[in-house]
């Protein structure tokens, strides 16, 4: 083994396994790119993103931690969302919840 080397176990790693998912269509109506991080409360994203915000309430992107999805101006794409976990309390972001979901 080399110092600092990481030897991963064989097989696949399942991320967010067993969590209920929904897929929604999102359009960027703005003139600037919008990037949304993995743990951002999706319902509170940039108002220039057009999608069903009620369906997205209490959910985040189903992507690896620390990554993001970028929406270019005029772009429409589908994203998969999973429920926020833990205490299911949301504070900050765009201050639209500020408490329990």
Swiss-Prot record:
One Pfam short name: Urease_beta
Subcellular location: Cytoplasm
Superkingdom of this protein's organism: Bacteria
Pathway: Nitrogen metabolism; urea degradation; CO(2) and NH(3) from urea (urease route): step 1/1
Keyword Iron assigned: no
EC number per UniProt: 3.5.1.5
Chief site of localization: cytoplasm
GO annotation terms (biological process): urea catabolic process
Keywords: Cytoplasm, Hydrolase
A GO term from the CC aspect: urease complex
Entry GO MF terms: urease activity
Catalytically driven reaction(s): urea + 2 H2O + H(+) = hydrogencarbonate + 2 NH4(+)
Entry's family note: Belongs to the urease beta subunit family.
UniProt-listed NCBIfam families: PRK13203.1, urease_beta
Subunit architecture: Heterotrimer of UreA (gamma), UreB (beta) and UreC (alpha) subunits. Three heterotrimers associate to form the active enzyme.
Protein name: Urease subunit beta
Organism: Sinorhizobium fredii (strain NBRC 101917 / NGR234)
């Amino acid at each position: 083994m080399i110092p600092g080397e990481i030897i991963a176990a064989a097989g696949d790693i399942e991320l967010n396994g067993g969590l209920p998912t929904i897929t929604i269509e999102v359009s960027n109506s703005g003139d600037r790119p919008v990037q949304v991080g993995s743990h951002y409360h999706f319902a509170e994203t940039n108002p220039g993103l057009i999608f069903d915000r009620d369906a997205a309430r209490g959910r985040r992107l189903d992507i690896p931690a620390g990554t993001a999805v970028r929406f270019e101006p005029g772009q429409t794409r589908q994203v998969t969302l999973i429920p926020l976990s833990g205490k299911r309390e949301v504070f900050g972001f765009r201050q639209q919840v500020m408490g329990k979901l």
